[in-house]
Amino acid sequence: MSVIDTNQIDLVAPRISEAGVADYIALLKPRVMSLVVFTALVGMLLAPGDFHPVLAITAMLCIAVGGGAAGALNMWYEDDIDGQMTRTANRPIPRGRVTRPEALTFGITLSFFSVMTLGILVNWVAGALLAFTIFFYVVIYTMWLKRSTAQNIVIGGAAGALPPVVAWAAVTGSLAVEPLLLFAIIFFWTPPHFWALALFRNDDYARAGVPMLPVVAGQDHTRLQILLYTIVLVAVAAAPWPLGYFSAIYGVASLALGGWMLVLALRVYRHRTGSAALRATRNLFKFSILYLFALFSILLLEVVAKAVWRLFA
């Protein structure tokens, strides 16, 4: 089966663009990019060895630009969906601020620039991983999985989990257990996060024809899956502590954060109708963002604290 939707090909004459700088910034999905940059930064700082500050900044910029490029290509391909959903109707392409050819050119240019710069100036292991991340998000997730299976964000979540792996490879030129643990945390965090969103945006996804789990399997089944994935997430996030990769401070914090996320997931499972159900899903969605940032912030603070201790010891 082809992953290319021929309906997405532009057959009309190009029109004059009204795009401004803000529109092109919006194409980069700044909120998503902030998560990409933050998790990548943690992966980079956890990596062993010395890394020149100029190369570190270069690598972070390339990862950020690569993530933004993937977002632009996602918007290029999904303009038909975005125009039908309340949450995305104000994006630059549905609003007519940016044309599809402009978004495509913008995304491809940034993708090429970020991958080549990272490969040439840093190393090609990181460059290849960044290229794979962009490819996976744009082709595997956006063009194929999102429109074809209710497991779209489960499999597609791998793309969002790769930035810390890319950043680790930028420092070391190789892979190790630690970045794969970070990958696993983000990977198992993705389903409960996005399914909570899908529960209170169910009508949006149904109207656009996107086979999100609540649309295909129903809300009750989705609530069960959220609970099951949250249980797995809590275990996976805590595992690096007893395995000796992360500290006891991280371990205790991960259990505390995970415990509260599990409580919120249980509320989503129990409250299935009315305002209580809506409030439960919104609370889980909001906390899931805080959960991931807090978990990675603890790792970041530990790295900084160790560096300061070595400096003054």
Swiss-Prot record:
InterPro entries of this UniProt entry?
A: Protohaem_IX_farnesylTrfase, UbiA_prenyltransferase, UbiA_prenylTrfase_CS, UbiA_sf
Q: Which reaction does it catalyse?
A: heme b + (2E,6E)-farnesyl diphosphate + H2O = Fe(II)-heme o + diphosphate
Q: Which domain of life is it from?
A: Bacteria
| GO (cellular component) term, any one | plasma membrane
One of the protein's GO biological processes:
heme O biosynthetic process
Tell me which Pfam families the record gives. Answer: UbiA
Which pathway does the database say it acts in?
Answer: Porphyrin-containing compound metabolism; heme O biosynthesis; heme O from protoheme: step 1/1
Q: What is its main location?
A: membrane
Membrane topology summary: Multi-pass membrane protein
Extract the GO molecular function terms from the UniProt entry: protoheme IX farnesyltransferase activity
Transmembrane segment boundaries: 32-52, 53-73, 120-140, 153-173, 180-200, 226-246, 248-268, 284-304
EC assignment: 2.5.1.141
Keyword list (alphabetical) reads:
Cell inner membrane, Cell membrane, Heme biosynthesis, Membrane, Transferase, Transmembrane, Transmembrane helix
Described purpose of this protein according to its UniProt entry: Converts heme B (protoheme IX) to heme O by substitution of the vinyl group on carbon 2 of heme B porphyrin ring with a hydroxyethyl farnesyl side group.
* PANTHER family, per the entry: 4-HYDROXYBENZOATE SOLANESYLTRANSFERASE (PTHR43448:SF7), PROTOHEME IX FARNESYLTRANSFERASE, MITOCHONDRIAL (PTHR43448)
Q: Which family does it belong to?
A: Belongs to the UbiA prenyltransferase family. Protoheme IX farnesyltransferase subfamily.
Q: What is this protein called?
A: Protoheme IX farnesyltransferase
